[in-house]
Amino acid sequence: MSARFTVKKLGAQGDGIAETESGDLFIPFTLPGESVTAARERDRAALMAVLEASLLRIEPACRHFTECGGCALQHFEAEAYRQWKRDKVVHALKGIDCSIDELVACAPHTRRRVVLAARRSETGMLLGFNRHLSPEIISISECPISLPEIVAALDRLRALADLICATTKSFRMAVTVTGSGLDVAVYESGKLGEHQRRIASNFVLAQGFARLSIDDEIIIEPRKPVVMFGSVAVAVPPGAFLQATEAAEQAMAEIVGTHLKRAKKVADLFAGCGSFALRLAAKSEVHAVEGDAAALSALDRGARFATGLKRVTGERRDLFRRPLTFKELNTFDGLVFDPPRAGAEDQSKQIARSDVPFVAAVSCNPVTLARDLRILIDGGYQVKSVTPIDQFLWSSHVEAVALLDKPRRRRG
């Protein structure tokens, strides 16, 4: 049953929040000050109509907005949206003495990697994103966050999903734009028979895709998918982690590189395929530490075949179970760490005890970043600046890069 509500503020996930007698009510796709009708179910409600619109409401960029759950904030005026994103970092770091820069904006049509949901239905193959907080898949024909190469291939990717589908359940298709073409990594689509493998392989060849892998097994690889990290070409493994946009990666690399420019020997923790390590190696020796063997192998190959780099070494290590100790860290004079959303609490405790003079912390979660920064501050580090980066356009997520140093008097 629908009722009328007045939205008071935006929540952390970008939902509008209305205050009711029974507590806060979360209404997606609404803005502060709006009067709306919505169908309530416990503490959430589905938007039915906007009765009085905010002056900050704009036309969304995509026809699928409000059905597709991929974006939360296309209806929010650009400047107000950017301020809200920056404020997420400000609020998370409340109580930490630091300068927070303006948000680094990222343009539409720049996301190079998307994870699509797929499922065979009675009407055909669905390929797109899940509806907001729902397992239902909204099949898409456009996507204004994604690179044009992905959007132009949606029909062909849908056809490929149909060819490889061997399950009645939904499955995932990660699509990455590389210098060699589209890298398609599929997960949980079911076991392929030999006939299906041949048909899928022929389709990939005909469509010019660089690679098809299923559950990390390479089905066919006409060309190795290559990504540039600065001047270094890296052949990335199936399902490799990459920053969402190349522009955001470049912005982060420049911020980190400037901070660590005086370091002669740098540690890159949670190094992935080398997006920081291989750029930093242009000026510094780098020791890259990463838990994923395939990613570390890709980094190593990229370094070995590159020219003009300082020495690059690699170490496979689970930094959650076995963080580098402060004694190990003391052999470096610069450090960057870029952990998953959970942050790097145990590793931060070791960094805090170390004498590394220059540290850069990269995070996609301001809450865990705040926790890790507090650990470093308590260990004698000073936060020089924090830069929010909007690489997850129109979502509630925001990246941030924090730069720290430890004054000489606080070392040892």
UniProtKB/Swiss-Prot annotation:
- What residue ranges are annotated as transmembrane? none
Write one Gene Ontology MF term.
4 iron, 4 sulfur cluster binding
Instruction: Kindly give the Gene3D superfamilies that the UniProt entry links to this protein.
Output: 2.40.50.1070, Nucleic acid-binding proteins, Vaccinia Virus protein VP39
Q: Known InterPro entries for this protein?
A: MeTrfase_TrmA_AS, NA-bd_OB-fold, SAM-dependent_MTases_sf, U5_MeTrfase_fam
Q: Which family does it belong to?
A: Belongs to the class I-like SAM-binding methyltransferase superfamily. RNA M5U methyltransferase family.
Residues in the active site? 364
Annotated CDD domains: AdoMet_MTases
Question: Single Gene Ontology BP term?
Answer: rRNA base methylation
- The kind of enzyme this is, by top-level EC class, is transferase
Per UniProt, the keywords (alphabetical) are: 4Fe-4S, Iron, Iron-sulfur, Metal-binding, Methyltransferase, S-adenosyl-L-methionine, Transferase
Asked whether the keyword Nucleotide-binding is assigned, the reply is: no
| Residues annotated to bind [4Fe-4S] cluster | 62, 68, 71, 143
Q: Which domain of life is it from?
A: Bacteria
Q: List the disulfide bonds.
A: none
Q: What is this protein called?
A: Uncharacterized RNA methyltransferase mlr7480
User: Would the keyword Ribosomal protein turn up in this protein's UniProt record?
Assistant: no
**High-level lineage:** Bacteria, Pseudomonadati, Pseudomonadota, Alphaproteobacteria, Hyphomicrobiales
Sequence positions that bind S-adenosyl-L-methionine = 243, 270, 290, 338
Q: What is its EC number?
A: 2.1.1.-
